[in-house]
UniProtKB/Swiss-Prot annotation:
Family matches, as SUPFAM superfamilies: Class II aaRS and biotin synthetases
Binding residues annotated for substrate, in chain numbering: S76, P77, E78, Y118, E251
PANTHER family per the UniProt record, alphabetical: ELONGATION FACTOR P--(R)-BETA-LYSINE LIGASE, LYSYL-TRNA SYNTHETASE
Assigned keywords, A-Z: ATP-binding, Ligase, Nucleotide-binding
Any single Pfam family the record assigns to this protein: tRNA-synt_2
Gene Ontology MF: a single term: tRNA binding
Assembly mode: Homodimer.
Catalytic activity, reaction form: D-beta-lysine + L-lysyl-[protein] + ATP = N(6)-((3R)-3,6-diaminohexanoyl)-L-lysyl-[protein] + AMP + diphosphate + H(+)
Name this protein carries in UniProt: Elongation factor P--(R)-beta-lysine ligase
Gene: epmA
Gene Ontology CC terms, in alphabetical order: cytosol
Family per record: Belongs to the class-II aminoacyl-tRNA synthetase family. EpmA subfamily.
């Protein structure tokens, strides 16, 4: 603690006042649309299995748990919120803290604010329109552009991501200056993600938000596969001014398929030398009981506020970043 002013907030009080106004505006947006605000636990006995996500882990040893209970800070409120959907909540949203034991920097903090909402009986496109409405209201930006994952690659990299083989993907990576890295990578989806980050993200969403939809089925996560094209998933992401803002799905409702995906994730984790994670059987039971067809999205509030305030980094809009807490 060599910085004598390190007790001070990361953000200015003026920015924190503006942040509070944006939070109130978000709540009004959903209140006007009849969406219920909910609160769910920040900890769980299960966690995400995604090989690219790293949760914080703790252990409860209080009265009634002499043997101890392993708990994980939530990387997103998704699993609990889907249980509410299955219980008949109707449309819901949540503003909450989420935690990822990963990066810190200009656009990352291990503790961050998430806006997540779910719309029963919405398809992916209807939810995209609602996200666009929120962005226009908060950011005062132009209506977004939309393009498929395939269109994005064809437009900016002149390659079809749904049919290209690994050799062709490596050739494009070479042109982008990442040939050595690509040559060491055997996973096709990782190669696609590399090309997306290097060749697509910098080119989209410069003047207005960009929605990219229909990611490859192999990157479906918790999304349904498209009934029109089984090569792609009903998944979208939102980018604006070089920042990924949101990730949304038409939600998978088949518990058996979801279990298979969780188990496949854990096999990938084992192959990568990572610990396998406990599967959320409560979520699987909720899906089995009958979660309604829904679409949902998770949006990074700190990044949204950063864009709204034209700030340079997250520390300009967060009261205390991890280096000051």
């Amino acid at each position: 603690m060599s910085d004598t002013a390190s007790w001070q907030p990361s953000a200015s009080i003026a920015n924190l006042l503006k942040r509070a106004a944006i939070m109130a505006e978000i709540r009004r947006f959903f209140a006007d649309r009849g969406v219920l605000e909910v609160e769910t636990p920040a900890m769980s006995q299960a966690t995400v299995t995604d090989v690219h996500l790293f949760p914080f882990q703790t252990r409860f040893v209080g009265p009634g748990a002499a043997a101890g209970i392993d708990l994980y800070l939530m990387t997103s409120p998704e699993y609990h919120m889907k249980r509410l959907l299955a219980a008949g909540s109707g449309p819901i949203y949540q503003l909450c803290r989420s935690f990822r034991n990963e990066e810190m920097g200009r656009h990352h903090n291990p503790e961050f604010t998430m806006l997540e909402w779910y719309r029963p009986h919405y398809d992916m496109y209807r939810l995209i329109n609602e996200v666009d409405d929120l962005l226009q209201q908060v950011l005062e930006c132009a209506p977004a552009e939309t393009l498929s994952y395939q269109q994005a690659f064809q437009r900016h990299l002149e390659i079809d991501p749904l049919s290209a083989d690994k050799a062709q993907l490596r050739e494009v990576a070479q042109k982008l200056g990442a040939g050595d890295l690509a040559n060491r990578e055997e996973d096709r989806d990782t190669l696609l993600q590399l090309l997306f980050v290097l060749g697509v993200e910098p080119e989209i969403g410069k003047e207005k938000p960009a929605f990219v939809y229909h990611f490859p089925a192999t990157q479906a996560a918790l999304a349904e596969i498209s009934p029109e094209d089984h090569r792609v998933a009903e998944r979208f992401e939102v980018y604006f001014k070089g920042i990924e803002l949101a990730n949304g799905f038409r939600e998978l409702t088949d518990s058996r398929e979801q279990r298979q995906r969780f188990e496949q994730d854990n096999r990938k984790r084992a192959a990568a030398g990572l610990p396998q994670q406990p599967i959320d059987t409560y979520l699987l039971d909720a899906l089995s009981a009958g979660m309604p067809e829904s679409s949902g999205v998770a949006l990074g509030v700190d990044r949204l506020v950063m864009l709204a305030l034209k700030a340079e980094q997250l520390s300009d809009v967060i009261a205390f970043t991890v280096d000051r807490c």
